[in-house]
Curated annotation (Swiss-Prot):
Binding site for Zn(2+): 647, 649, 671, 732
Keyword Metal-binding: yes
Protein name: 5-methyltetrahydropteroyltriglutamate--homocysteine methyltransferase
Cofactor detail note: Binds 1 zinc ion per subunit.
Entry binding sites for L-methionine: 437-439, 490, 605
Annotated residues for binding of L-homocysteine: 437-439, 490, 605
Catalyzed chemical reaction(s): 5-methyltetrahydropteroyltri-L-glutamate + L-homocysteine = tetrahydropteroyltri-L-glutamate + L-methionine
A biological-process GO annotation: methylation
InterPro entries: Cbl-indep_Met_Synth_N, Cobalamin-indep_Met_synthase, Met_Synth_C/arc, UROD/MetE-like_sf
Co-factor requirement: Zn(2+)
GO MF term (any one): 5-methyltetrahydropteroyltriglutamate-homocysteine S-methyltransferase activity
EC number(s) on file: 2.1.1.14
Length: 765
């Protein structure tokens, strides 16, 4: 019997109940030792491997585990340690590893940014003066562990050298190939050790291949993989791409490797078309990513099987590997942890474990015939049909509103230059007004009280009284700090997207649908399963209460449509732009309710706008136009003297600055401190006419910045931005920080602001 091969590309690290997160945080807090951390994480790792083994996955990834991030792991493997961490050679300690990611008092953390167009963050390699040496072969360690403990012949996973270097900073185009030449021998050393240990397959991830780049760069891949092939001829290398199609399909599939991994889900149909046009080398394996590794909806297995049957016309079945489109890092572990979900929605879901089941079903169908999995196919067919046809998915009123969008105003009544005068008149703020981004620390008491409320251990009245008490306490703290524009603190919210999902029709929260965002930070994206509709006021009560406590303006705080889309698991049966407009119409009603109730500064956060950009620049225009439209749909109906703010996270902005301006927000705040001034250079080169706050300190590190550091950041920004346009704020929300460090950092921020403000006022006189 000719057998197709089942494979996985990576498995979630978090654990079914976030055990990985808790272990890390216990270690950071000093409540467990390093040995205990290693033991706890090993147990989690082996449990994940055993599940994949029991499900019948043929090629099980090893080395996809990390204590923080796989890109940081690669840096540490090769000794790419920034000098400020004073590493003196040899294996990198776990404490140094975490210091690079999180910072310490005398050394700022390395920059963190989004992994391609996902909500996962990686630690950016600092490549200046890089001199790679293999310090620790993690891939070999995890391979030997899986073999010894479980008898698994695992498939080690590496971040490929070109992708790794492209993700780094501190090198330039002229020196790239010189730098690459330094890394090739270090990678070969890893591969030689793997080959010697008896490894059959190794997966080398090169998602850079799925981006847009100049064709001449293909020569770099030819050079690297030819070097690998010559050094380890007995090792089967799977060159793995994902998140998009290949611009240079014909060249990539002819690279000197044993297998090419291609995304057949997020490729807009390009991959199958390329296969039909150019064929596929008969001596290679095609690893077909046909199960969506980035969303949670059950696959239409009939359609997937038809796709694989098409592919099998060009690739022999024994050379066909069935796998997810990308690592399952981006989805929760198992839907079996969600017994309380509505059965129609639950039936339509597929988390990591269920996706592995789907892969095994499809592989068996290819090998043994459709009849061998007839029962499983029928079950999937029925579940998808029931969800698609259910009232859960279809709201006729919402569909009518979407059809009527041409009659809805999406522009502010006055242009910015006119309405900002009206806003200044009543706000009466000083030069360099100060604010924060939205959330304040959620202490153990906040989390425990919310948990008690959710369990029914305290009444609604008791919970609301606690939230009001915490809100009042932080309004007072902000006034004592002398912050100009206040926030209510968001103590009622677990997450800036999940909270809205709990209040809007068409959303469903999960209990354990957690995915890793960065480090130990996990998010629980809501499920957008149906048409989205406004059903009740979402933020009005808390905002109005906070405003009643102070004469200073308090910002209403909402999350914008594209961020809600990008940070949710969105239904896959209608275009995302339609869902974004449904969200925009619902939030428009919330914005109007805030304004009606006296909230005249409203922040509509769009932190994920750039991360959702398609990897192919040719697809940008539609995405950005859709994003601007849904944002303006949310905000355009307010009065001219109501000030609209927005906030954006880790991003490169130089190529979307026109889009940012087109959002027509009166004030934008941007996360900038970890990029060490790179974003500021964007504003040195363009004229931005609206008001702007560039984050003056990094909130992702527990380190408290000095007044001098903050002043340096302010002054650097003021070289590019007119003082009258400039706001001062932290990089991002402060929910994950501890209270003492938060207050200390804000004190430094206000002190720094007042000193710089005084300097400018003297200059003006």
């Amino acid at each position: 019997m000719v057998k197709a091969i089942s494979s996985n590309l990576g498995y979630p690290r978090l654990g079914e109940k976030r055990e990985w997160k808790r272990a890390l945080e216990k270690f950071w807090n000093g409540t467990i030792t390093e040995e205990e951390l290693l033991a706890e994480t090993k147990a989690l790792r082996l449990h994940a491997l055993k599940k994949q083994q029991e499900k019948g996955i043929d090629l099980i990834p090893v080395g996809d585990f990390s204590f923080y991030d796989q890109v940081l792991d690669t840096s540490v493997t090769f000794g790419i340690i920034p000098k400020r961490f004073q590493h003196e050679g040899g294996n990198v300690s776990l404490n140094t590893y975490f210091d690079i990611a999180r910072g310490k008092n005398d050394a700022v953390a390395s920059e963190m940014t989004k992994w391609f167009n996902t909500n996962y963050h990686y630690i950016v390699p600092e490549l200046a003066d890089a001199n790679p040496k293999l310090l620790n072969n993690r891939a070999l360690y995890y391979y030997e562990e899986a073999k010894k403990e479980l008898g698994i012949e695992g498939k080690p996973v590496l971040v490929g050298p070109i992708t790794y270097l492209k993700l780094g900073k501190g090198s330039n185009a002229e020196s790239f190939e010189v730098l690459l030449d330094k890394f090739i021998p270090a990678y070969i050393e890893i591969l030689e050790e793997l080959e010697t240990a008896g490894v059959e397959w190794v997966q080398i991830d090169e998602p850079y291949l799925a981006t847009s780049f100049e064709k001449k760069e293909i020569a770099l891949f030819e050079k690297v993989y030819q070097s690998f092939q010559e050094a380890v001829p007995n090792l089967k290398i799977e060159l793995q791409t994902y998140f998009e199609s290949l611009d240079y399909y014909e060249e990539v599939v002819n690279l000197p490797v044993a297998a090419i991994g291609i995304d057949f889900v997020h490729d807009h149909g390009d991959s199958l078309q390329a296969l039909k046009t150019y064929g596929f080398p008969q001596d290679k394996y095609l690893a077909a990513g046909v199960i969506d590794g980035r969303n949670v909806w059950r696959s239409n297995l009939d359609a997937k099987l038809a796709l694989l049957t098409d592919i099998a016309h060009y690739v022999a079945k024994d050379k066909l590997i069935v796998q997810p489109s990308n690592s399952l890092l981006h989805v929760p572990v198992t839907k079996l942890s969600e017994p309380d979900l509505d059965e129609v929605i639950l039936g339509g879901l597929s988390f990591a474990d269920q996706k592995l089941d789907e892969i095994v079903i499809l592989t068996k169908a290819l090998t043994e015939g459709v009849e061998s999995v007839a029962k499983e196919l029928e079950e999937a067919r029925k579940a998808v049909k029931v969800l698609n046809e259910s009232s859960h998915r279809n709201n006729l009123e919402v569909q009518a509103a979407i059809a009527n969008l041409k009659n809805v105003r999406v522009d502010r009544e006055l242009v910015f230059a006119e309405r900002i005068k009206l806003q200044h008149a009543w706000l009466n703020l000083p030069l360099f007004p100060t604010t924060t981004i939205g959330s304040f620390p959620q202490s153990p008491e906040v989390r425990k009280t919310r948990a008690d409320w959710l369990k029914g251990n305290i009444t609604d009245a008791e919970y609301n009284a606690f939230i009001e008490k915490e809100t009042a306490r932080w309004i007072k703290i902000q006034e004592e700090l002398d912050i100009d524009v206040l926030v209510h603190g968001e103590f009622e919210r677990t997450d800036m997207v999940e909270y809205f999902g709990q209040k809007l029709a068409g959303f469903q929260a999960t209990k354990f649908g957690w995915v890793q965002s960065y480090g130990s930070r996990a998010v629980r994206p809501p499920l957008i399963y149906g048409d989205v509709a406004f059903t009740e006021e979402i933020t009005v009560k808390e905002s109005v209460y906070a405003q009643s406590l102070t004469k200073r303006p308090v910002k209403g705080m909402l999350t914008a449509p594209v961020t809600i889309i990008n940070w949710s698991f969105v239904r896959d049966d209608v275009p995302e732009s339609v869902v974004a407009n449904q969200v925009g119409l619902a939030l428009r009603k919330e914005v109007e309710a805030l304004e009606r109730n006296g909230i005249k500064v409203i922040q509509v956060d769009e932190p994920a706008l750039r991360e959702g950009l398609p990897l192919k620049q040719a697809r940008w225009e539609k995405y950005l136009n859709d994003a601007v439209y849904s944002f303006k749909l949310t905000t355009a109906s307010v009065q001219n003297d109501t000030q609209i703010h927005t906030h954006m996270c880790y991003s490169d902005f130089d190529d979307i600055i026109d889009t940012i301006s087109a959002l027509d927000a009166d004030v934008i705040s941007i996360e900038t401190s970890r990029s060490h001034g790179e974003i500021i250079s964007t504003f040195e080169e363009v004229t931005y006419d609206k008001e702007i706050g560039l984050g003056v300190y990094d909130i992702h590190s527990p380190r408290v910045p000095t007044v001098t550091e903050i002043q340096d950041n302010i002054r650097r920004a003021l070289r590019a931005i007119d003082a009258k346009q400039f706001w001062i704020n932290p990089d991002c929300g402060l929910k994950t920080r501890q209270e003492p460090e938060t207050i200390a950092a804000l004190q430094d921020m206000i002190k720094a602001t007042k000193e710089v403000r005084a300097e400018y006022q003297v200059l003006e006189k």
